[in-house]
Amino acid sequence: MKNITIAIDAMGGDHGLEIVIPACIRAVKNNPDLKLLLVGVQDKISASLKKHGMLSCQQFTIVHASEVVTMDELPSHALRNKKDSSMRIAINLVKEGRAQACVSAGNTGALMATARYVLKTLPGIDRPAIVSELPTMGGKTRVIDLGANVDSCAEHLFQFAVMGSALIQAIENKPKPKIGLLNIGVEEIKGNDQVKRTAHMLAECSVMNYVGYVEGDHFYSGDVDLVVCDGFVGNVALKASEGLAKLLLTVLKESFSRNWLTKIAGLIALPALKHLKNRLDPSRYNGASLLGLNGIVVKSHGGANEVGFQHAIEQAVLEVKNNVVDLVRDQINDFINQGLLL
């Protein structure tokens, strides 16, 4: 597929243009057929592009937006009062067909509320959910939901499993992704009523490859392709994982810097350490998909660096190339036709 167009919320995130513009430059250099609609305050975007010598780049088009959704703004306030925000206009561009996807590092709650209002959910889906990758011993696994819904019933968790499974089938060409339900133990007697009801629904659905309960350590074992949980638990697990990865890398760096002997050992181990850093670096897994919408929306971590935001853009490109929305919609329609979804 050529001429992919992505709308970028250029003003969102903790760092705004300082990170977004360099990341966009990296993305277009890697993708000659990629066009980016940079949404935000025109003068500021122009100045940033000029600073990086990219003002005349044909792969960039500036779309002016006079407002910015702040990171601490209430979603309801952003939805009602920020109709000319960079976030809102970027999502509108997807609805209007001028962009095939949207990427934002902005306020998660506001992004979810705005995307749901503008794009609407797919038939059979009550709530969108956030899904992203985590590194494992054997490669990677995906986790859904990572914070879109902090209180989900069994029916919603079942819908998350359907959407996550469809995403993996589309992107990784796996016909039967292994699905695990996050719980405090693998025994059937463990868990609250919500988890037990979800487990029963998944077990009764022969269409999906449900393998049972998984515990927190299964995030990294690679035993399953998709871990299903509510957004409260998923978000806590994600942030804890990112913190642990940073701690491990920091401790290793300090350990090899203690004296001349450890510095020599560090030089010898440098190739292995670089490999470890690449495997664990959270920026390499940045870019979470908002599944269940009539359009592609990718959420970048608010504090992402250039590499991280670039990965979020490339995640959007990947989803466009693989027609993720259409494939998820087809999967959901199959479930509706079989009476598995209402």
From Swiss-Prot:
One function term, GO molecular function aspect: phosphate:acyl-[acyl carrier protein] acyltransferase activity
Catalytic activity field: a fatty acyl-[ACP] + phosphate = an acyl phosphate + holo-[ACP]
Enzyme class, first EC level, given as a word: transferase
Compartments in which it is found: Cytoplasm
Enzyme Commission number: 2.3.1.274
Family under the similarity heading: Belongs to the PlsX family.
Subunit structure: Homodimer. Probably interacts with PlsY.
Function: Catalyzes the reversible formation of acyl-phosphate (acyl-PO(4)) from acyl-[acyl-carrier-protein] (acyl-ACP). This enzyme utilizes acyl-ACP as fatty acyl donor, but not acyl-CoA.
Protein name: Phosphate acyltransferase
Organism of provenance: Legionella pneumophila (strain Corby)
Phylogenetic placement of the source organism: Bacteria, Pseudomonadati, Pseudomonadota, Gammaproteobacteria, Legionellales
